[in-house]
Amino acid sequence: MAESGLAMWPSLLLLLLLPGPPPVAGLEDAAFPHLGESLQPLPRACPLRCSCPRVDTVDCDGLDLRVFPDNITRAAQHLSLQNNQLQELPYNELSRLSGLRTLNLHNNLISSEGLPDEAFESLTQLQHLCVAHNKLSVAPQFLPRSLRVADLAANQVMEIFPLTFGEKPALRSVYLHNNQLSNAGLPPDAFRGSEAIATLSLSNNQLSYLPPSLPPSLERLHLQNNLISKVPRGALSRQTQLRELYLQHNQLTDSGLDATTFSKLHSLEYLDLSHNQLTTVPAGLPRTLAILHLGRNRIRQVEAARLHGARGLRYLLLQHNQLGSSGLPAGALRPLRGLHTLHLYGNGLDRVPPALPRRLRALVLPHNHVAALGARDLVATPGLTELNLAYNRLASARVHHRAFRRLRALRSLDLAGNQLTRLPMGLPTGLRTLQLQRNQLRMLEPEPLAGLDQLRELSLAHNRLRVGDIGPGTWHELQALQVRHRLVSHTVPRAPPSPCLPCHVPNILVSW
């Protein structure tokens, strides 16, 4: 028996070593740690030093990387590599990331030589691409059809290709500003098949005329800071949805525009033509226009006929032109019935323009040659809330005591930098700000300030006032007055008690 028992041990040992039957599905204890397994979840793949806050997001911003990182998960949809030192994009690495929707390469050292033609070929779901602030000399020949936003600004791009931005039905925004693009580097079919582009920025390039065949879907077009001297006839005939057009800082002359240049822009609200070489207001302005910038041109006269179509204009900016005594003849602005603000800073006007629109709210006329204010000069604009006549040639003897009588809504009056020797009479009682610095005021009397109980700020710096030149009762009604800016301040002494007036006088700081 003993021998037979010993003989069974090898068989029992063999049975113990044999694997058991496979487990029945649904009967395993999920909480039981099986051999070789860990209680911790498997770590997600994330490149060294980068952060991966989500399974689809890899952030390698500002790590001074010189080589494209490996170990990027194929599940990545958002990859940020901005602010590094990358010089090239390896095709084999990018081709793995076919699910990318956002690729940010802003502020690297990527050159066109380091960007293969097929670099983005496999990124069929890419929607947002930023390669701004790199060293590209030509744009990529091919960008994915799925693209919605493309930013190639601040490179050295001299040429783009038909399929860089063409045939992109979902493309909405293209940023190409601060490059070296000339018209020769912009093919006529550059945007063919991309009928959804709403924003196109081509500012700070070397364009000499407005590019043809722009997308008809445009809403915002930036062309400032180029060399544009001409808008070809019909170049803007299809852009009926355009709302904002920026053409400032170019070389536009009157001959570079015609009566049809802007006439088809039935949605245009904002037009900036400042810093050009225009001598007249352009013709054919659309009725929808609300803001027109014409500052820093060479305009000598404004003709009513040129503004007849722009009846909806609210802001007209004509600062730093060559408007003289006949620059704004009576009725020139009459078509602009809804005009809110008129800027005429830095011209040669010797009087307030006559027959201004009745609804005008802000008249800005500093640094002109206005030497007088007559009794009727401002009667046509009773709704004015801001009047700026600073740095003109106004003398007290030539400011009529009824010049401001109709300006009951006026809140801000700037008469700084003139030749006034006393406060004007008849100031509107609703004034809150009165600027009188840099005149020749020799005294302050209570009568001109009577009733100005809403005045909050009164500036008298750089006049010829002394403390003793301020008459008793001058400050009586200025209970809310505050002087915000002062160089040398004196506390105004309280006036001696008057038998007719209460002695409650504010302690006011005034600068002179």
Curated annotation (Swiss-Prot):
LRRNT domain ranges (all copies): 37-74
Domain of life the protein comes from: Eukaryota
SUPFAM superfamilies to which the protein is assigned, alphabetical: L domain-like, RNI-like
Any one GO CC term of the record: extracellular space
Intervals holding LRR repeats: 75-96, 99-119, 125-146, 147-167, 170-193, 196-216, 217-238, 241-261, 267-288, 289-309, 312-332, 338-359, 360-380, 383-396, 409-430, 431-451, 454-474
PTM remark: N-glycosylated.
UniProt main location, coarse: secreted
Glycosylation sites: N71
GO molecular function: extracellular matrix structural constituent
The keyword Ribonucleoprotein belongs to this UniProt entry's keyword annotation: no
PROSITE patterns xrefs: LRR
Keywords annotated in UniProt: Extracellular matrix, Glycoprotein, Leucine-rich repeat, Repeat, Secreted, Signal
Subcellular location: Secreted, Extracellular space, Extracellular matrix
Entry keyword Cell membrane: no
Record Pfam families: LRR_8
Homology family: Belongs to the small leucine-rich proteoglycan (SLRP) family. SLRP class V subfamily.
Matches recorded under PANTHER family: AGAP008170-PA, INSULIN-LIKE GROWTH FACTOR-BINDING PROTEIN COMPLEX ACID LABILE SUBUNIT
Protein known as: Podocan-like protein 1
Recorded name of the encoding gene: PODNL1
